[in-house]
């Protein structure tokens, strides 16, 4: 069975780390260039000052660039997510939304640089 963007969004929303952090994948685009993810700040996902817990926000953002790139490059390539960085601009309250975009041109650039097995 081929994974579709809709199936992956549902599966990722039900995945235990996301589910219990109030994280819902709203959608993956049909061409795997975009994803939208939401986190509902509630009693389980907030910190002592009633804003979004940083660990939950990190979980909300961690796998999506990797997944978009992996689906664009295909099975002939191995994609590893080796580090992440978050700048907390302001306290998160209510529903937090993250948008992820990996343009086709960027995926093609990575494919060309990795041609022949080179690390990118």
List PLM regions with ranges:
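Hot-dog-fold acyl-thioester-processing enzymes
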Residues: 44-64, 77
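HotDog/MaoC-like acyl-thioester-processing domains
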Residues: 93, 103-120
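Short structured motifs
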Residues: 20-25, 82-88, 108-109
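Hydrophobic beta-strand-centered segment that forms part of the acyl-chain substrate-binding groove
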Residues: 68-105
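Alpha-helical membrane-targeting segments
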Residues: 1-20, 44, 48
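Hydrophobic alpha-helical segments of small multi-pass membrane proteins
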Residues: 55-59, 63, 83-87, 102-104, ...
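Short connector loops at helix/strand junctions that flank enzyme active sites
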Residues: 18-20, 32, 52, 60, ...
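Catalytic strand-loop segment that frames the active site of acyl-thioester-processing enzymes
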Residues: 20-51
């Amino acid at each position: 069975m081929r994974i579709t963007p809709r199936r992956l969004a549902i599966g990722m929303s039900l995945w235990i780390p996301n589910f219990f952090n109030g994280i819902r994948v709203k959608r993956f685009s049909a061409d795997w260039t975009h994803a939208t993810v939401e986190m509902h700040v509630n009693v389980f996902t907030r910190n002592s000052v009633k804003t979004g817990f940083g660990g939950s926000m990190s979980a909300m953002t961690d796998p999506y660039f990797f997944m978009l790139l992996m689906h664009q490059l295909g099975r002939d390539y191995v994609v590893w997510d080796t580090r992440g960085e978050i700048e907390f601009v302001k306290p998160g309250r209510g529903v937090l939304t993250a948008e992820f975009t990996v343009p086709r041109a960027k995926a093609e650039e990575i494919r060309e640089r990795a041609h022949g097995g080179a690390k990118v």
